[in-house]
Regions:
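Sec-dependent N-terminal signal peptides
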Residues: 4-15
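Alpha-helix boundary/capping residues
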Residues: 11, 44-47
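Sec/Tat signal peptide C-region and signal peptidase I cleavage site
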Residues: 16-20
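Amphipathic N-proximal alpha-helical interface segments
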Residues: 21-24, 47-117, 123-191
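Short N-terminal segments immediately surrounding and downstream of signal-peptide cleavage
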Residues: 22-37
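Short, structured motif recognition centered on aromatic/hydrophobic residues
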Residues: 40
Length: 191
């Protein structure tokens, strides 16, 4: 029941009163692209949980947290590591569907259709593939692409049992709000 309620809240928070064409109009747990992370937690809290990127070409740092969330089981936020204002560059929300990929994909489809019905002129790109970090795991992605190249990714991740046990991961649904500038930076860093 908690997951059903979470999906309904998720859908409602992704909707906007008018047909939006700006990715900054979308929120995850009340947080939007362009907000300062300092509006949601102290600098000390950020420094305790921040993660530096392993790839030196990546300028964005990340936090993941699970405290005081209403809709998601976890939230991830990225910002430029040199930005002292911690302006949010991208964010994602995670809902766990461990060993329940059928319901994960069902909710993914519901969210995708709801967003498509709420926002016109989005291009849908669906992909399925093997996870790079888990050769026996899979991903199922619906990317909703704005005319300017911004993306809302709705992804189901299905990890193998050995990978789950080793890394303490669970299968999950992840909704990511990804501006084109952020996506371009990652694409360039991994060339």
């Amino acid at each position: 029941m908690k997951k059903l309620l979470a999906i309904l809240v998720l859908i409602l928070t992704l909707q906007t009163p008018s047909l939006a064409d700006d990715i900054r109009d979308f929120q995850i747990e009340g947080i939007s692209i362009g907000d300062s992370l300092l509006d949601y937690m102290s600098e000390e809290e950020i420094k305790e949980i921040q993660r530096k990127p392993a790839n030196k070409k990546i300028k964005y740092w990340r936090i993941s947290y699970r405290k005081n969330l209403k809709t998601y089981d976890a939230v991830q936020i990225w910002w430029d590591g040199k930005d002292k204002n911690y302006k949010i560059a991208s964010l994602g929300g995670i809902i766990e569907f461990d060993n329940d990929m059928n319901n994960c994909k069902k909710k993914q489809n519901e969210i995708t259709i709801d967003i498509q019905n709420s926002i016109k002129n989005l291009r849908l790109n669906k992909q399925t593939g093997q996870l790079s970090q888990d050769k026996d795991g899979n991903f199922y992605q619906s990317a909703l692409i704005f005319e300017n190249g911004d993306i809302i990714n709705i992804q189901c991740y299905e990890f193998s049992k050995p990978y789950k046990n080793k890394h303490n991961y669970v299968d999950n649904l992840k909704v990511m709000i990804v501006p084109k500038k952020f996506d371009d930076h990652y694409q360039e860093a991994y060339k």
